[in-house]
Amino acid sequence: MDIVGGQHLRQMWDDLAGIYEDKTALIFESCAGEVQHFSYASLNREINRTANLFYSLGIRKGDNVALHLDNCPEFIFCWFGLAKIGAIVVPINARLLREESAWILQNSRTSLLVTSAPFYPMYRQIQQEGRTPLSHICLIGPTLPAEEGVSHFYTLKAQQPDVLLYTPPLTPDDTAEILFTSGTTSRPKGVVITHYNLRFAGYYSSWQCALREDDVYLTVMPAFHIDCQCTAAMAAFSVGATFVLIEKYSARAFWGQVRKYCATVTECIPMMIRTLMTQTPAADDRHHCLREVMFYLNLSVQEKEAFTERFGVRLFTSYGMTETIVGIIGDRPGDKRRWPSIGRPGFCYEAEIRNEQNRALPPGEIGEICIKGIPGKTLFKSYFERPDATAKALEPNGWLHTGDSGYRDEEGFFYFVDRRCNMVKRGGENVSCVELENIIAGHPKIQDVVVIGIKDDIRDEAIKAFVVLNEGETLTEEDFFTFCEENMAKFKVPSYLEIREDLPRNCSGKIIKKNLK
């Protein structure tokens, strides 16, 4: 099924500007509460000016340009401005430090970076060290340092016309983006994403939550992340809806923002749901317009039920990863839901559970979740300059090995068990970290938890739990281990406990387990 045809992102924005004109496309709210509005026509003009800015800096079709930005309108301008001239955006996780950021610049062969004032000193140091291809920094900020190799984003953009100066031929198969995976367990890999991928994501994700042009899709997810781009932004823009981008997530501000913008759809990760539940209950908890809350793994049954009961919302399960572009398994519009299932495959995809010999397993048996799609269209195209990693993950016939363990039932509902790399091998038994985390999260004194395996000379691996307590609470090791012994099999009970003030997370909310080992 080809639902994109010959369309690319330049054509998309020209069409949207003509169809929706003065309708609000983008609303941005900063941490300071400042709000900016852009219509479809005005946003397209900003995108064109930004495309011309890059052209003036020597960027041409096929060139890579990095972005290291917090959520801001300029991210949207750059993302689509680069696509319009056939250049390739390389978003960098806004929480990465110098060595990690330099590694991405080096491995993506990127010479031009757009960043903002808080990150400038780090990149100036990288630039001066000369260990990466970085030769020019385009700075978004109130002032411009008088330094060579640095230009001011808004000064350059103000000099540009709002009609494109450079329009090279584009096809849907052209690369639009290299999005590096979060690298929570190892070095990140660059996921190559095409114009077709992004156009398809818009159609698919808008179908997934039955999005219409009168909807308002609000997100606090980071703009450099696949969820913000393909589940939220592309979905909203593809149907002419309004996309509300919040600079940073605040549990105290979230519901006020939902009400302020009359949001009808949003997306949440477990960390958000847990912190929202820690807020003092209010009489207006259910006073909102939300129709759907897109939800990503993992929540316990108790957490899910408590959240839906308190706020009067439906959690709409969506399972995917950077390589799948969208949530390829999930709850479908108008279809029944079966918690704790992650749902059923969406259109254009097939899914199977396979064993270690790569053979399909029958219902009820746990194996690897594998997805069939079309590389460069409904799945990522490849890993950037990593043919070895591409061949390991993606079969020639389009089957993607997710690395996740799961099973399916007789009706085709799929169930997520854990990341294969997130299983602890303990004395011959495979133990799911997610299973233990969901149980431990049920302790009334615990706010957050992560479980990892650590080396054990006798039993291969021992289990260690890191927990964050609710404010003002104390917890003894005896109480913790007693709770575990009462709620899980003996071989699953952690051997070690560490109480921390917080857990290391990346901008998408995933815990960085390698920082705990």
UniProtKB/Swiss-Prot annotation:
Catalyses which reaction(s): 4-(trimethylamino)butanoate + ATP + CoA = 4-(trimethylamino)butanoyl-CoA + AMP + diphosphate; crotonobetaine + ATP + CoA = crotonobetainyl-CoA + AMP + diphosphate; (R)-carnitine + ATP + CoA = (R)-carnitinyl-CoA + AMP + diphosphate
Family matches, as CDD domains: FACL_DitJ_like (cd05934)
GO annotation (BP), single: fatty acid metabolic process
GO molecular function: carnitine-CoA ligase activity; crotonobetaine-CoA ligase activity; medium-chain fatty acid-CoA ligase activity
Database matches in InterPro entries: AMP-bd_C, AMP-bd_C_sf, AMP-binding_CS, AMP-dep_synth/lig_dom, ANL_N_sf, CaiC
Primary enzyme class: ligase
Pfam families xrefs: AMP-binding, AMP-binding_C
Entry EC no(s): 6.2.1.48
Pathway annotation: Amine and polyamine metabolism; carnitine metabolism
Keyword line: Ligase
PROSITE patterns reported for this sequence: AMP_BINDING (PS00455)
HAMAP family, A to Z: CaiC (MF_01524)
Similarity remark: Belongs to the ATP-dependent AMP-binding enzyme family.
Function: Catalyzes the transfer of CoA to carnitine, generating the initial carnitinyl-CoA needed for the CaiB reaction cycle. Also has activity toward crotonobetaine and gamma-butyrobetaine.
Name of the protein in its database record: Crotonobetaine/carnitine--CoA ligase
Organism: Salmonella arizonae (strain ATCC BAA-731 / CDC346-86 / RSK2980)
